[in-house]
Amino acid sequence: MAASTAAGKQRIPKVAKVKNKAPAEVQITAEQLLREAKERELELLPPPPQQKITDEEELNDYKLRKRKTFEDNIRKNRTVISNWIKYAQWEESLKEIQRARSIYERALDVDYRNITLWLKYAEMEMKNRQVNHARNIWDRAITTLPRVNQFWYKYTYMEEMLGNVAGARQVFERWMEWQPEEQAWHSYINFELRYKEVERARTIYERFVLVHPAVKNWIKYARFEEKHAYFAHARKVYERAVEFFGDEHMDEHLYVAFAKFEENQKEFERVRVIYKYALDRISKQEAQELFKNYTIFEKKFGDRRGIEDIIVSKRRFQYEEEVKANPHNYDAWFDYLRLVESDAEADTVREVYERAIANVPPIQEKRHWKRYIYLWVNYALYEELEAKDPERTRQVYQASLELIPHKKFTFAKMWLYYAQFEIRQKNLPFARRALGTSIGKCPKNKLFKGYIELELQLREFDRCRKLYEKFLEFGPENCTSWIKFAELETILGDIERARAIYELAISQPRLDMPEVLWKSYIDFEIEQEETERTRNLYRQLLQRTQHVKVWISFAQFELSSGKEGSVAKCRQIYEEANKTMRNCEEKEERLMLLESWRSFEDEFGTVSDKERVDKLMPEKVKKRRKVQADDGSDAGWEEYYDYIFPEDAANQPNLKLLAMAKLWKKQQQEREAAEQDPDKDIDESESSSF
């Protein structure tokens, strides 16, 4: 008992007795201390030796040491969550999911309010496809921290991505019980609308406007009903909003939106009553926008019809004068048609359109037709969207296509717009017939692409193949088409067919972007893990071009293959490239190759390999050359930089002479310096001759 008591007491250190209290002979200042500390900071510590793990025992030892390090860091400061996350991510990188899970759980015990910790934990489970574990984590997170919106968003997004619509809806319902901010409600509504659940979205809006009873939210609710053509419901929403806010909290924006809705429904008397009711109860200072919109409405439909008629008639007369003076002023026709569409009857609008399209450009050049063709586009869109007359829309498209001189030029947009219209009318054969006619009359890249895109959306892959074949017959130099065709076959799983397409493509005598095609072919073979085929492709490409980027890419491919001897093969490629490019006129490309080689040796080579490449690096020298003007006269001299490679210098006598001249100049400078210094032996300068 006495021993334990004595051990438990703290030992008090003995006070050192100072024998000599006189000041030291050499005093150390604070400045000296700081200088020494700074000098020690500049000392470079050697990097720790790289450890290469060769067997399981060493791996286990490495894991044990790393875990001990992480545990020590955590023990020092448990509240630093980044240490926990790094520890868990390290365990995850080793596929030790259970250990990572345990670490996250321990971290949550330390700080369960840390948002990042929950997110990293759940993301780990999702990344490893542990869906149920991820669900449990999200469930715990939203239960523990229900006011963190990020948890709810990610939880619902995960459920939706998994196709669990009912589960996502259940999560949203739990979220709404907490009455979150407005954006959360909008997310729920948009979720339901993505699955065409209009009735559910309406129910959510009903709850939303009660939780967040702002004017803008009531307006959004009404516009939602209007957008889905529930006009009676939209009117009821506006009426409920007016009743909800009453006379004490009236807002002009609500009444403006209500009036515009009724205006769109052509209920002009209702519009007038709404404006008058609001203006009678809202002060003029707060009703500027309301009064402005009422004035515009009255100019359109109300008692001020005479004023409106004068304004419209004046503008119409102005446009008539402009189009009479220059019938081919298509901008004036556009303005005129915009005015007529906003005010006149459908027959009047059609009459003006017919007058406008009658002014065909006199010259059959595409640049003169670009503005004119949009008259036909707008005419067709008006008939389809405003007049709701599909038959007349079809006639407009057909008339425009008959008018265009397809032998000289065409407008792919007109063919595509027509085909899209027929698809909207569910006349797929008509759309195909139109596009087939277009590529028969006037084949064009945009037409082929549009037709192929249509058939792809319809999953008609055989038709896509035929279209690609015709496309490539029309433009065999188009590399993009070859690549897209091969990618289609790859997606369909026909690898041999895709390879045959690539072989046909690279055998073409003329290509617009051959480098893109070759890269795509090489990437395709790499994806198929055909190492030998890829190597042969690089060899074929190097027979056609000796570009430095091809050599570098070839070397990097050999290095990335991961097979035994890949480093040696990569080095062999660099050596072969260096030998090949000795006669290359572009010295910058040769320098680029050597720099890439040096980077490779820095990472994988030995000291001798690095020194060998360093010896091949060129010297940068400044030179002068004559410059000639465009007329052939002498324009003086210009300086430029050139590169002298050691291999070239050894084979050129003039470069040897230049090196000797530099040495002689250096010796001359040393002799002059020696003559100026009397303490130096003057006889040393006599050795300057060569």
From Swiss-Prot:
- Give residue spans, biased composition: Acidic residues: 680-690
Broad class of where this protein is predominantly found: nucleus
Task: Report each HAT repeat as a residue range.
Answer: 61-93, 95-127, 129-161, 163-194, 196-227, 229-264, 266-300, 310-342, 344-378, 388-424, 459-491, 493-527, 529-560, 565-606, 608-646, 648-673
Q: Which GO terms describe its molecular function?
A: RNA binding
Q: Name one GO cellular component term.
A: nucleus
Is Transmembrane included in the keywords of this UniProt record?
no
Gene3D superfamilies found in the cross-reference section: Tetratricopeptide repeat domain
Give the UniProt family note: Belongs to the crooked-neck family.
Q: What is this protein called?
A: Crooked neck-like protein 1
Name the species this protein comes from: Rattus norvegicus
